[in-house]
Regions:
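A conserved regulatory-domain signal marking ACT and ACT-like small-molecule sensing domains
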Residues: 2-14, 26, 30-32, 37-154, ...
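The feature encodes a structural signal of leucine-rich repeats
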Residues: 21, 160-161
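Intrinsically disordered, low-complexity, positively charged segments
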Residues: 15-23
Length: 272
């Protein structure tokens, strides 16, 4: 699941404060006092953090196994026998099938993720999803440590030192990838025309594509997610930067699209 949000970036003594709302914190199980691993690429305005020390050799697996005696133990034993470190795992039974997820570190190991997949299939299981951090090697060299804290009001924030690259104050877009417990923070400089767009879509094929097409005519989209609660069924949130035209023009285009039932725009940190 991908969960997105927005935060103000405030300068504090010794560094920067990036607030984390309840939606992001809930997706990643964050709490005050927790230490997170993090890293950024030189010249980049993005910081990646995680509850686990991810690196380019970490892989995520979702595995389905037949519910036979010892099937779950066999999968776990497979990782252990190869000397692969399981950073996180979980499983549950669904009818006569076991659904299990693993995040495993293959760093400095002779075995590869492909080897594990082949052997899992030999055990009678099948891998339905596999996201490999090798696809994003620069995003997952998490060697620094940062801390989650809480202010006087109990609101959580990530405390960053002054020398973290890309931070200039202003605002940040937060993108939580719950499957691998990772949070990507894109920093935007003060004055950037950041927008928060909310849209209620008609439940017909192509509605989300239409919304994306309309917004993309004027906005560089950074993050999109659906509001996953009953009161907001069909509501989508988009965070992006206005590139051309006015907000009034954007709203007019959305109102002309039958696929879009409601469309709202809020400026973040600037006025038109």
């Amino acid at each position: 699941m991908i969960v997105c949000g927005h935060s103000k970036v405030e300068r504090v003594e010794g560094g920067w404060r990036v607030y984390i709302d309840e939606k992001i914190a809930g997706a990643l199980n964050l709490f005050p006092g927790q230490n997170l691993f993090g890293g950024s690429t030189v010249g980049s305005s993005r910081l990646s953090v995680s509850t686990m020390q991810l690196n380019p050799h970490v892989s995520y697996f979702r595995v389905f196994m037949e519910d036979i005696m010892g099937s779950l133990a066999s999968v776990t034993e497979l990782f252990s026998s190869k000397g692969v470190n399981i950073l996180s795992s979980g499983a549950f039974g669904l009818g006569n099938i076991w659904v299990s997820e693993y995040i495993a570190d293959f760093k400095d190991k002779d075995v590869t993720a492909d080897d594990i997949v082949n052997e899992l299939e030999g055990l009678g299981g099948f891998v339905t999803s596999r996201e490999i951090t090798e696809f994003f090697p620069q995003a997952f060299e998490l060697e620094s440590t940062y801390q989650i804290k809480a202010d006087d009001k109990g609101e959580m924030y990530l405390l960053l030192p002054e020398n973290v690259g890309g931070v200039t104050g202003g605002h940040a877009i937060l993108k939580a990838w719950a499957d691998i417990q990772a949070l990507f923070i894109d920093f935007l400089s003060p004055g950037t025309k950041l927008l928060e767009i909310s849209a209620m879509l008609n439940d017909i094929p192509g509605a989300l594509n239409k919304l994306s097409s309309v917004v993309a005519t004027q906005v560089n989209m950074h993050a999109v997610d659906a509001q996953h609660h009953e009161e907001a069924t069909g509501l989508w949130m988009i965070y992006g930067v206005l590139q051309i035209g006015s907000i009034e023009e954007l709203v007019s285009k959305a109102e002309d699209a039958p696929e879009i039932l409601k469309f709202g725009v809020r400026t973040l940190g600037w006025t038109e």
